[in-house]
From Swiss-Prot:
GO biological process, one term: tRNA wobble uridine modification
Stretch forming the signal peptide: none
InterPro entries per UniProt: FAD/NAD-bd_sf, GIDA_C_N, MnmG, MnmG-rel, MnmG-rel_CS, MnmG_C, MnmG_C_subdom, MnmG_C_subdom_sf
Domain of life: Bacteria
One Pfam family per UniProt: SAM_GIDA_C
Residues where NAD(+) binds: 272-286
Function statement: NAD-binding protein involved in the addition of a carboxymethylaminomethyl (cmnm) group at the wobble position (U34) of certain tRNAs, forming tRNA-cmnm(5)s(2)U34.
Amino-acid positions noted as binding FAD in the UniProt annotation, renumbered to this chain: 13-18
Gene Ontology terms for molecular function: flavin adenine dinucleotide binding
Species in which this protein is naturally found: Hyphomonas neptunium (strain ATCC 15444)
Name of the protein this chain belongs to: tRNA uridine 5-carboxymethylaminomethyl modification enzyme MnmG
Family assignment from sequence similarity: Belongs to the MnmG family.
């Protein structure tokens, strides 16, 4: 066997979490290895051919702001860009794109192949090397030992993964690929709290056999907006998606065979994603509906495969054939790959610190579906943070942790390590208390400087960020120096309160009825401001009054987060706690008073008792 030098960080798994983890670690400067079964599956999109969406698009922008790879590669491979939620406020707009699977996979493999400080190793991970309770590396399927002081596990659905199609059970991490067994056993042996979750994927159809002329078609946006702050336009050819619906006949077939579904037959014990239910779940839970929407999503520009989003199932193949052909437009559809459900092991993320490090084993980090999440974007965000924090720890530096007022990444990780999961977790804008500030449009202004300070942002992005930051500051300052009386505003056709108070152009821009073009008619010098800067300034001004009020809430959050709790605190010594609250605090071991307050069931009275005890301990110490 070839000898490998010791690495600073080893990342196990070449999916979306693993790719971001390996890239972030390498960008920081750590000697990094990515261990994956096959180079050819790095960057594979195992389920839907899409990136972004409501909440998820915010995560992609944040990954990009920290110089991650997902957004840039999605721009290279995106074949139908759409901004979701346009009818609502900009804070909840969700960038999304259909993705050409082949283009994305090839772009990811090309990106990582020449990444400085990164070595790709084609092998499986059978076990961890542990000495004196500390991580020392990884043992491959070949028996090869790879040394490292930090290891990031990003195994997706591979931990004891098992595919279900009707009564069939197939050990697999995904279709056609073996599961990871030894690694799962090792995690159990560490004493980590673990469980089973499930997810599913629909059949893949031959687009040449679909009656597209019978369907409603959904085009891309006329002016696609890129994910990456480094890109100003999309050059990939855009395509349309089809929309169809299930029928009462579809539902009748599914109901007649419900007991043959792996989920309803009892073959699967793990819970599936609430917000991405199988078609059996939809029929069972929403019996009053006579149809459910199905999006027919092309998987590539030169690929005839179509992904029917909305009909994932674990029913037998012959039942799938029957019910699919009752859907308008799919009467003659040929199935290229049947749908399946997959059940897999996960670790209760409350076993992790906010740095995504395993509390019981320093040096071991987890990211992605192993932590109970679902989705490429959630995986990528965790991967970036786990990889960065592993690399920083390897060089003796403190972890980077975002709070809930800084980033959706902060919301995601705090939810996981504080509240845990009982079903696959996905991001929504509604999970963020400070979503008016955590917008997709300003992710770079929120996070890129933090990334620069953390050592994870390249010089090119840093330079572009500083140019944009200065342009925004200049535009804001100019708008705040230009003033107009209410009487003059009315003469320009603006409906404003005639209170005699002179207002700045910035204040006028906060009125919904007044846009930047209106201001430029009064102050022609504003026309010189670039369109990109104008777009963000308009959004900032619109929310300015709300953001000023929200600043008090953020300050309160930061005060609570500043009150740290010793990691070895003996909760049995705290009076006034119920047994339930005491057990929850022991399980999570919150690092701050703020985190303790977000644990389900922890009351204000319990927080007061906890705070008093911590202060007494500090005073005595």
């Amino acid at each position: 066997m070839p000898d490998f030098p010791d690495f600073d960080v080893i990342v196990i798994g070449g999916g979306h979490a693993g790719c971001e983890a390996a890239a972030a670690s390498a960008r920081f400067g750590a000697r990094t290895a990515l261990i994956t079964h096959k180079r050819s599956t790095i960057g594979e999109m195992s389920c839907n051919p899409a990136i972004g969406g409501l909440g998820k698009g915010h995560l992609v922008r944040e990954i990009d702001a920290l110089d991650g790879v997902m957004g840039r590669l999605a721009d290279k491979a995106g074949i139908q860009f759409r901004m979701l939620n346009r009818s609502k406020g900009p804070a909840v707009w969700g960038p999304r794109s259909q993705i050409d699977r082949k283009l994305y996979r090839e772009a990811m493999q090309s990106e990582l192949a020449d990444y400085p400080n990164l070595t790709i190793i084609e092998d499986g991970a059978e076990d961890l090397i542990v000495e004196d309770g500390l991580i020392r590396g990884v043992v491959g399927l070949t028996g090869q030992r790879y040394g490292a002081s930090k290891v990031v596990i990003t195994t997706g659905t591979f931990l004891k993964g098992e595919i279900h199609i009707g009564a069939k059970r197939i050990p697999a991490g995904r279709i056609g690929e073996a599961p990871a067994l030894g690694l799962s056993d090792r995690l159990y042996s560490i004493g980590l709290p673990m469980g089973r979750l499930k997810t599913g994927t629909p059949a893949r159809l031959d687009g040449r056999t679909i009656h597209w002329d019978r369907l409603e078609m959904q085009p891309a946006d006329e002016q696609p907006i890129p994910f990456s702050f480094l890109n100003s336009e999309i050059t990939v050819r855009q395509v349309q998606c089809g929309i169809t619906w299930t029928t009462p006949e579809t539902h009748a077939i599914i109901e007649a065979h419900m007991n043959e579904s792996a989920v309803y037959s009892g073959a699967i014990s793990g819970r599936g994603p609430r917000y991405c239910p199988s078609i059996e779940d939809k029929v069972n839970r929403f019996g009053d509906r006579d149809r459910h929407q199905v999006f027919l999503e092309p998987e590539g520009l030169d690929d005839h495969t179509v992904y029917p989003n909305g009909i994932s199932t674990s029913l037998p193949e012959e039942v799938q054939e029957k019910f699919i052909r009752t859907i308008p437009g799919l009467e003659d559809a040929v199935i290229l790959q049947h749908a399946y459900a997959i059940e897999y092991d996960y670790v209760d993320p409350r076993a992790l610190s906010p740095a995504l490090e395993v509390k019981l084993m320093p040096g071991l980090y987890l990211a992605g579906q192993i932590n109970g999440t679902t989705g490429y974007e959630e995986a990528g965000a965790q991967g970036l943070m786990a990889g960065l924090n592993a690399a920083r720890a390897a060089s003796g530096k403190d972890p980077v942790i975002f709070d809930r007022a800084e980033a959706y990444i902060g919301v995601l990780i705090d939810d996981l390590v504080t509240r845990g999961v009982t079903e696959p977790y996905r991001m929504f804008t509604s999970r963020a208390e400070y979503r008016l500030a955590l917008r997709a449009d300003n992710a770079d202004q929120r996070l890129t400087q933090r990334g620069i300070d953390a050592g994870v942002v390249c010089e090119t992005r840093a330079a572009m960020f500083h140019v944009k930051h200065r342009a925004l500051e200049s535009a804001r300052n100019l708008l705040k120096t230009l003033n107009l009386s209410p009487a003059a505003a009315v003469r320009n056709g603006w409906a404003v309160n005639q209170d005699g108070r002179i207002r700045s152009a910035w204040e006028y821009l906060s009125y919904k009825e007044i846009c930047f073009d209106h201001l430029a008619q009064v102050w022609p010098e504003l026309s010189a401001i670039p369109a990109e800067i104008v777009a963000q300034i308009e959004i900032e001004a619109l929310y300015s009054a709300y953001l000023d009020r929200q600043a008090e809430d953020v300050a309160a959050l930061r005060r609570d987060e500043a009150l740290s709790i010793p990691s070895d605190l003996d909760y049995d010594l705290i009076g006034g706690l119920s047994n339930e609250v005491r057990q929850k605090l022991k399980s999570v071991r919150p690092g701050t008073l703020g985190q303790a307050g977000r644990i389900e069931g922890v009351t204000p009275g319990a927080l007061t008792a906890l705070l008093g005890h911590v202060r007494r301990v500090r005073k005595a110490g």
